[in-house]
Amino acid sequence: MNGQLNGFHEAFIEEGTFLFTSESVGEGHPDKICDQISDAVLDAHLQQDPDAKVACETVAKTGMILLAGEITSRAAIDYQKVVREAIKHIGYDDSSKGFDYKTCNVLVALEQQSPDIAQGVHLDRNEEDIGAGDQGLMFGYATDETEECMPLTIVLAHKLNAKLAELRRNGTLPWLRPDSKTQVTVQYMQDRGAVLPIRVHTIVISVQHDEEVCLDEMRDALKEKVIKAVVPAKYLDEDTIYHLQPSGRFVIGGPQGDAGLTGRKIIVDTYGGWGAHGGGAFSGKDYTKVDRSAAYAARWVAKSLVKGGLCRRVLVQVSYAIGVSHPLSISIFHYGTSQKSERELLEIVKKNFDLRPGVIVRDLDLKKPIYQRTAAYGHFGRDSFPWEVPKKLKY
């Protein structure tokens, strides 16, 4: 069933069920371009200097990339090359697509890390005892509704974008361009605090395309080659609503269509609106920035609790102060899905996890140049990362 332009539908929602929506964006979305460039810069430094202190923000607009931030590192980096390679990998390789890695202007405004921060966080300290790079609060979330312990809404939204990129790169759909957005609404049933996906209610896909392809051809291909290849058939029914290329035309995309900034897709990067978010972005930051490392650790804790059978759904909060190594607080919320109390789960977490940044970096191997891969399709729910390997808990 195709969605109406005014969005109205008469689908009835049964008692005890609810709708939840998550979105994702593709590699060529302007904000995601910036995330990937920031993490490409971080990786370039870590390859040469695993102890580099990096805070790199990126701005993208038509024909221009700006790097801004603070970096202290022994590495010698060719920023022009790093930026252009990242854009080339994304697929902006011709001006007809609105952006070209060969001709864009790359501006660099990078300085040293503030000595005030350095002396307060890591100078003259053992690695285990380094302080948090800033204050803040971070969350980790896990749910047993999927094998990945991630919400189905965000899993499907990411996979739709990944399928678009695959079909673009292998030439199956040559009219595709790198910029894309997806959104998935799932109907859930509540089950004693846990959530059970029943069906996919609505799917939205908007993807950049060339001038020649017609709208009907695009909509047909998106349904047959993208949605049906990604979304399990059991979740689709005759009442599922599709908004495919709802604007009708999306030729101008990427940084030409909208300016891009690092750190503007923090919900896409995490749990798609489930759980909670402390507000700190990930990309372009080394492990001393707890916005990133502690959020990864909190996810590790949450997934370990769910995979260990201690609860079906859980939210973990941690908080830090700049220069202080131990977290100020750790909180566990299990939504009533555990036979143990939240206090008992907290004791298990404290017994099994050391959440100081200098220990997180060792446990999760965060000095390795792995970050550019995290910067598209979500930082969580992908098996290749250490924080996705659940820890066997002792209690």
Swiss-Prot record:
Flexible loop: region residues: 113-125
Family matches, as InterPro entries: ADOMET_SYNTHASE_CS, S-AdoMet_synt_C, S-AdoMet_synt_central, S-AdoMet_synt_N, S-AdoMet_synthetase, S-AdoMet_synthetase_sfam
Q: Which residues carry this modification: N6-acetyllysine?
A: K81
Tell me which residues bind K(+): E57
Q: So what does this thing catalyse? A: L-methionine + ATP + H2O = S-adenosyl-L-methionine + phosphate + diphosphate
> What positions does the entry give for Mg(2+) binding?
D31
Q: Name one GO molecular function term.
A: metal ion binding
Keyword tags = Acetylation, ATP-binding, Isopeptide bond, Magnesium, Metal-binding, Nucleotide-binding, One-carbon metabolism, Phosphoprotein, Potassium, Transferase, Ubl conjugation
Where does the secretion signal sit in this chain?
none
Q: In which pathway does it act?
A: Amino-acid biosynthesis; S-adenosyl-L-methionine biosynthesis; S-adenosyl-L-methionine from L-methionine: step 1/1
| Record: residues binding L-methionine | E70, Q113, D258, K289
- EC? 2.5.1.6
Assembly mode: Heterotrimer; composed of a catalytic MAT2A homodimer that binds one regulatory MAT2B chain. Heterohexamer; composed of a central, catalytic MAT2A homotetramer flanked on either side by a regulatory MAT2B chain.
The note filed under miscellaneous reads: Protein expression is regulated by post-transcriptional regulation: in presence of S-adenosyl-L-methionine, METTL16 binds and methylates the first hairpin of the 3'-UTR region of MAT2A mRNA, preventing recognition of their 3'-splice site by U2AF1/U2AF35, thereby inhibiting splicing and protein production of S-adenosylmethionine synthase. In S-adenosyl-L-methionine-limiting conditions, METTL16 binds the 3'-UTR region of MAT2A mRNA without methylating it due to the lack of a methyl donor, preventing N6-methylation and promoting expression of MAT2A.
Family in the record: Belongs to the AdoMet synthase family.
The protein's role, per its UniProt record: Catalyzes the formation of S-adenosylmethionine from methionine and ATP. The reaction comprises two steps that are both catalyzed by the same enzyme: formation of S-adenosylmethionine (AdoMet) and triphosphate, and subsequent hydrolysis of the triphosphate.
Instruction: Name the chain's protein.
Output: S-adenosylmethionine synthase isoform type-2
Q: What organism is listed for this UniProt entry?
A: Mus musculus (Mouse)
